[in-house]
C-alpha cells in the first residue's frame, strides 16, 4: 500500500516557474494532487476558484499571475486589473488591509508568497508543501475562525446586512460566509 502511495505522489510532482510582477524565476514543486491531502487541521470551505468567482480582495488580487494557476479558476473570476473595486466583493464591502500593512505586521513570507495568505492557499491547493510555512498559515487560518463565531453569535442566520464587512473578510479566508 505504501508503495502505491509513493508512486502516486511521484506522478504528481511538477516544478512550477513563476514570473510575475512580484516574483521572477521563483520555483516551487507540486508534491500532492490538486485539492487533496490537506493537513487535518486545515479544512477550507471554499476553493480558490470559488473564491475568485464570488468576488474577493476587490478583484485586484493576482491579476498578473493567471499563467501560474489553472485557466478555469479565472473563467468566472471577478477581477479588475486596474484597481481595487469593493463592488466586486461578494458583500460589496472593503474588508482587507493593504499589502504594506500585512508586511508591517509580519504576515508576509516574502520568499515564498509575497502576496500573502491567499497566494499561499492557492499554491497549497495546487499541491505545494512547505511544512513550516504551511503550519504557520494554517494556524493563522484557524485563528480567523473567531470572526465566524462573532457573526454566528451576533447575527440571524443569512442576514447578510449584519456584519457584511466581517462576512467578506471570512470569504477572503475561505470560510463560506454565505452559509451563516
PLM region spans:
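Short Lys/Arg-rich cationic patches that frequently serve as NLS/NoLS or arginine-rich RNA/DNA-binding motifs
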Residues: 1-16
Amino acid at each position: 500500500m505504501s508503495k502505491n502511495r509513493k508512486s502516486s505522489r511521484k506522478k504528481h510532482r511538477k516544478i512550477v516557474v513563476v514570473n510575475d510582477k512580484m516574483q521572477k524565476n521563483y520555483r516551487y514543486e507540486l508534491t500532492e494532487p490538486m485539492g487533496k491531502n490537506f493537513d487535518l487541521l486545515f479544512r477550507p470551505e471554499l476553493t480558490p476558484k470559488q473564491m475568485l468567482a464570488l468576488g474577493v480582495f476587490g478583484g485586484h488580487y493576482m491579476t498578473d499571475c493567471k499563467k501560474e494557476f489553472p485557466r478555469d479558476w479565472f473563467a468566472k473570476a471577478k477581477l479588475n486589473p486596474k484597481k481595487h473595486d469593493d463592488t466586486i466583493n461578494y458583500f460589496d464591502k472593503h474588508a482587507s488591509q493593504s499589502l504594506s500593512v500585512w508586511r508591517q505586521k509580519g504576515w508576509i513570507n516574502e520568499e515564498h508568497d509575497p502576496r500573502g495568505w491567499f497566494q499561499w492557499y492557492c499554491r497549497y491547493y495546487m499541491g505545494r508543501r512547505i511544512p513550516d510555512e504551511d503550519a504557520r498559515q494554517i494556524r493563522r487560518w484557524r485563528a480567523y475562525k473567531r470572526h465566524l463565531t462573532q457573526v454566528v453569535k451576533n447575527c440571524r442566520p443569512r442576514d447578510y446586512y449584519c456584519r457584511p464587512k466581517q462576512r467578506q473578510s471570512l470569504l477572503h479566508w475561505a470560510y463560506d460566509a454565505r452559509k451563516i
